[in-house]
Amino acid sequence: MLDITMFSKADSVKGQGVGSAYLELMRLLRTHWQDEFNIKVNRYGHAAISHYHTVNPMFYLSTFMPNRGRKIGYVHFLPETLEGSLKLPRPFQVIFNRYLISFYKRMDHIVVVNPTFIPKLEAYHIKRADVTYIPNFVSKREFYEMTKAKQLRLRQQYGYDQNKFMIIGTGQIQDRKGVPDFITLAKQNPDIQFVWAG
């Protein structure tokens, strides 16, 4: 049995995509691989693999411990993708950005959830061979196509045209989530309902 320690505070803020992805991964591991993996969360004892989901300072310090095993880091964001979402005074933003990249450089291997992050990580002198793209898991229990009747009920409940085609965007309201493009498309296509939930 492989000893894995998950380091995460991703589920401490409800509704965050990072938290949802982490919880879904944990559910999958515990459901399908409980006989292969001994998973602990936020423990500082020996581990063959330490899997970092969030960049908390205590987790960063743990990367210097000799018993961490292979350090794997999930990269959900980069300094440039936080612009407009993390509001810090300029000097603190610079310090945080350096800390973030330093955290990522402490990893033996990095998993990105967005393939566009790979060349950006290379620009920070992280080797391409040390980066793997794996998209987030999506729970089919929570995300599924609704019946037509339920769609119509929700359209009526929220005051949307029953007959107009609708495009829905979800996520935090940030440039990196594509909000400006979404708004541009909405302006160019007034015959379509554009709704952003997040």
Provide a role label for each language-model segment.
Residues 1-47:
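N-terminal pre-catalytic "stem/leader" segment of glycosyltransferase-like enzymes
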Residues 39-59, 72:
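Short N-terminal targeting/anchoring amphipathic segment
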Residues 49-51, 65-84, 111:
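Active-site proximal beta-strand in glycosyltransferases
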Residues 91-110:
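Membrane-proximal helix-turn-helix segments that form the acceptor-binding/catalytic region
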Residues 106-115, 132, 195:
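A short beta-strand/loop micro-motif in the catalytic core of glycosyltransferases
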Residues 116, 137:
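Carbohydrate-associated surface elements
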Residues 122, 138-156:
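Acidic anion/phosphate-binding donor-loop and adjacent secondary structure
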Residues 155, 161-177, 183-187, 195:
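Conserved donor-binding/catalytic core segment of Leloir-type glycosyltransferases
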